[in-house]
From Swiss-Prot:
One protein family per Pfam: MatP
Protein's UniProt keywords contain Cell cycle: yes
GO molecular function, one term: sequence-specific DNA binding
Annotated source species: Klebsiella pneumoniae subsp. pneumoniae (strain ATCC 700721 / MGH 78578)
Signal peptide: none
Stated name of the protein: Macrodomain Ter protein
Subunit structure: Homodimer.
Function of the molecule: Required for spatial organization of the terminus region of the chromosome (Ter macrodomain) during the cell cycle. Prevents early segregation of duplicated Ter macrodomains during cell division. Binds specifically to matS, which is a 13 bp signature motif repeated within the Ter macrodomain.
Length: 150
């Protein structure tokens, strides 16, 4: 496992995930009967700051179909949490117009690289081009000086 699991922190994430799914109208409990489901949800809503009880609630009441999705969400959240600790792993976002994103995605796909790798490669190409142009300009100037054509 690459990232350490922090039970109390992740329990809070799980609680927030379940409450969000409930508010979005998803069935978060294993119960078909509405009153039993509502009683379980009401119980969950009181457990916000009780990590051990949230875990017990999940074991006892949660809809099994939701388990895999919740695990994936928590795994992604854990990764973002630990990556945010270091500048070099912290993710940033940029807004692109759809047409720009489409062209960039197409280029990345043709090159077999990620969007980030493609952007870095384009920046490096532009830097090399600038360096080459500067070097050529300098050589041209030096050649003109040698030939006495200032």
């Amino acid at each position: 496992m690459k990232y350490q699991q922090l039970e109390n922190l992740e329990s809070g994430w799980k609680w927030k995930y379940l409450v969000k799914k409930h508010r979005e109208g998803e069935l978060i409990t294993r119960y078909i009967e509405a009153s039993a489901a509502q009683a379980a949800v009401d119980d969950l809503l009181t457990l916000e700051n009780e990590p051990v009880l949230v875990h017990a609630w999940i074991e006892q009441h949660m809809n099994p179909a939701l388990m895999n999705r919740m695990k994936q969400t928590i795994r992604a959240r854990r990764k973002r949490h630990f990556n945010a600790e270091h500048q070099h792993t912290r993710k940033k976002s940029i807004d692109l117009e759809f047409v720009v994103w489409q062209r960039l995605a197409g280029l990345a796909q043709r090159r077999g690289k990620t969007l980030s790798e493609t952007i870095v490669q384009l920046i490096e190409d532009a830097e090399h081009k600038e360096k080459y142009a500067s070097k050529m300009s300098s050589l041209k100037h030096d050649l003109q000086v040698l030939l006495g054509k200032e």
